[in-house]
């Protein structure tokens, strides 16, 4: 896969970590960049700046040490508020502003934000025009294929986006009504790619190197947005890049390497969030890392009762040292891709 340009920035391998609320915090973004992501995007930040003083919102902002280019996703349904939020994030260090018109969550859509905006093409245009005019950095957009299967207007929205000055577009291959059920469809993404000249990134159900190649071939997309498949498997980016370059799959990770990555991730979470919140946040990540391993269910029940950072790290070490064998119960197990 060739490099993709977004304004002055180059995504060297066309692979982007999709923004995911509650997941793509700074520790996870840094880890995914280290393990092959060409660009990482922050968690969604509300455009309502009156809410930015909460600890939750502050932690979602750009921080020292964030890998460049620093991309921040904003969400909202008011053009002026979105423009103001974009400008404020640039002042805080954002180098790319990403607009969320793809989130299907009810709490977002009920506020006429996220993928709810796809119902109102004029409002889509107003928001995009306002944000692009407000900042001097590239503005990107994430959408779904439409509101529901009878209203797949992703192609129209993509044309609106290009005319408004959006510099790259990510398309999830489901409608808002689909949520995350069923399978993503890629025909609409292919149509969008043919209709616009800005870079298009395909998203949805890309969970293996082989699937990545299939989606690229099916859509003609310039790159890929990887989301849920990176949870507990941040090395998926280098797996995909290697496969696309060579046609060969990388060997599965040894358990010792998974242990190292997981402990590094836990330590970063504990530092970033502090002991109390860091312990809570770490629980879901550990569940994702170990989901396919024998004994993981019992271990998670124990791990989720731990209340301090040292105990969490010690128990992870013990889990791996007690002969964690992997899917085939082999010594020095390999983690299945």
Swiss-Prot record:
FMN binds at residues 19-21, 73, 142, 203-205, 227-228. Its cofactor is FMN. PROSITE patterns: UPF0034 (PS01136). Keywords: Flavoprotein, FMN, NADP, Oxidoreductase, RNA-binding, tRNA processing, tRNA-binding. It catalyses: a 5,6-dihydrouridine in tRNA + NAD(+) = a uridine in tRNA + NADH + H(+); a 5,6-dihydrouridine in tRNA + NADP(+) = a uridine in tRNA + NADPH + H(+). InterPro entries: Aldolase_TIM, DUS-like_FMN-bd, DUS_fam, DusB, DusB-like, tRNA-dHydroUridine_Synthase_C, tRNA_hU_synthase_CS. The active site is at residue 103. One of its GO terms (molecular function) is FMN binding. Its EC number is 1.3.1.-. Catalyzes the synthesis of 5,6-dihydrouridine (D), a modified base found in the D-loop of most tRNAs, via the reduction of the C5-C6 double bond in target uridines. Belongs to the Dus family. DusB subfamily. HAMAP family: DusB_subfam. This is tRNA-dihydrouridine synthase B.
